[in-house]
Amino acid sequence: MKWMTRARPKTDRIACPWLIRGFIDPDAAIIYAHADEVIERARAEGARTFDAPGAEFTHRDNKCSFEVLIDEFDLAKDNPALMRLAKIVHAADIAADRGSDPLAAGLEAIGVGGLDVEADDQLLFERATFVYDALYAWCQREVGSRAT
């Protein structure tokens, strides 16, 4: 399936496709488009939309798109590590809640800095996937250590 969002991804627009490929649609084709073209182009291409104005999955009720996807696809069940990651992504993406998680500033810095390092959005996403894989692994360790 095709999934489309706004170009020049950082934080939420990197976290969401990581979540989509890892937990929702492993074969997802992630497409980055100009913000004013996302909805119309997605309709024409039969793509699902996220983290864009008017998108199917976007910020709502003080939740970032990553959290909305987790809720919509019922991914929180039995996955405390994913919920820990969601708190970090939320704190890095939602301006009113910045600073609510100690790891958020680092994730936000990586997201913003990534835009300066890589001009190609697809390559930026592919390169940033490692960061989310590593952070999710840390979250698994973190929640696992609290459970024992």
Positions of the model-derived regions?
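Extended, well-folded catalytic/binding cores that form a central cleft or groove in large enzyme
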Residues: 1-8, 18-148
